[in-house]
């Protein structure tokens, strides 16, 4: 990473950690919908600084919430999913986001019965719905941001006035 990547890295780390630890919990069955998952689609714009930032943010949030050894593997799974979103950005950010949902939901389906003692079917439905809600909210934000970004890029510099 270059020096100019440090800003987005810190911002995405803070978004995940503060969003998960600082905001009220949103429960969906047995799973907590993590606000920190919302900016996952933005890795298509901000690249690996966002991938590393969200991964570190998840690690920090897990230290504050569920510090079990198995739960500490979650950032590695998340990193792989975020890297998939980044790699698929030129093909389809939505496809990358769906792959992220499937990967992380599968991991959470395995993790929740171990850490919470709930049934696998409840874990699967809770994790899938929770991840889908959070990631698709983020995808909506990404879609708006990318359209604004495209319209700003299409504006000739000569038409911009400063007053």
Locate each region found by the language model.
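Hydrophobic transmembrane alpha-helices
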Residues: 1-52
